């Protein structure tokens, strides 16, 4: 999977370090940030993996406003979820798509979305792109409790 060239992300060290989570770095729009946070929380509750059907059901729930933020229904278009949130997370390597997993219940292989947890050192590199990448990956890892 590749990342489209028209994707705009502010990768300044100041923005990355001052952001509260990885979604503030990846997405400019507040509504998109909220949708991605909800998705990450939902995915974490499922052990970091979900089938295409489960992700589709989650996208439907976003569209119909069944998911709440602070007791208020949150609506986000299914199309925007797939095109903006899911595509960027897969394209940047935060999620893997079509990962084969053996399903003990049905006794067959199923293909799922799987969150990546990055193996990063305890200390960040000193300068440059790798330093910024380190902090982005650390923020992503902190999103998932497993």
What are these regions (language model features)?
Residues 110-146:
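Short, amphipathic alpha-helical interaction segments positioned at domain boundaries
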Residues 48-73:
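Short acidic, hydrophobic short linear motifs in intrinsically disordered regions
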Residues 72-92, 97:
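Short amphipathic alpha-helical interaction segments
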Residues 6-52:
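Short alpha-helical segments that sit at the start of domains
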Residues 94-96, 102, 120:
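Charged, amphipathic alpha-helical coiled-coil/dimerization segments
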Residues 99-109:
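Short, Lys/Arg-rich nucleic-acid/phosphate-binding segment
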